[in-house]
Amino acid sequence: MGVVQLCYNTQNLVGTGCYERDGGLSGFGREVVAEMNRVGIMCDLSHVGPTTSEEVILESKKPVCYSHCLPSGLKQHPRNKSDAELKFIADHGGFVGVTMFAPFLAKGIDSTIDDYAEAIEYTLNIVGEDAIGIGTDFTQGHGQDFFEMLTHDKGYARRLTRFGTIINPLGIRTVGEFPNLTETLLKRGHPERVVRKIMGENWVNVLKDVWGE
């Protein structure tokens, strides 16, 4: 196991998720972060609230990540991250994976690969070319029961949200269409050097830093 989500949307013993009033990182949570640093597991804050996230970023001795998120500057949603949150994690050596999960994109299920590229560019302008990568959050092959679980606290309790139809942006709906993203970023004027970083080189570098490989 190389990456662990510290909270999933709501409160647990470590801290607070992004759908609740955030009480911050607990004392036990600090022990968890220290142990994850020791054994080489990356702290993932994608579903974590802003206060807990900030305290994990400051507590961790290794880079942490939002492995799959989008900027709230393009769409307000509890799962999306503010410009300040994105800048804070990057300024402290962390990493941002930009997701293509349609409900969090500005145009929802009407999004295209260019809308996803816009989200990448928005994030890139905040975090810089070395702290950004792809965070697909692909969920192909799962039935409605899976999404019902995701939208309830702890998978079964109170409902937190409704996703509606789940479909990836047109042009990058499967892993097989990933070359389309490379082509799109190049066509939008990004240098090949930067596109290589976004498409995977940056992830390799940050994971080596955490895992020690």
Where are the model-predicted features located?
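Short acidic/histidine-rich active-site segments
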Residues: 127-152, 160-165, 170-171
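Extended, charged catalytic domains and RNA/DNA-binding interfaces, predominantly
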Residues: 1-110, 117-125, 131, 152-159, ...
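Mid-to-C-terminal alpha-helical segments outside catalytic/metal-binding sites
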Residues: 164-213
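Active-site micro-motifs of SAM-dependent methyltransferase domains
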Residues: 71, 140, 205
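Short, surface-exposed alpha-helical recognition segments that flank or form part
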Residues: 44, 111, 169, 173
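A structural motif corresponding to the C-terminal end of an alpha-helix
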Residues: 35-41, 126-129, 181-194
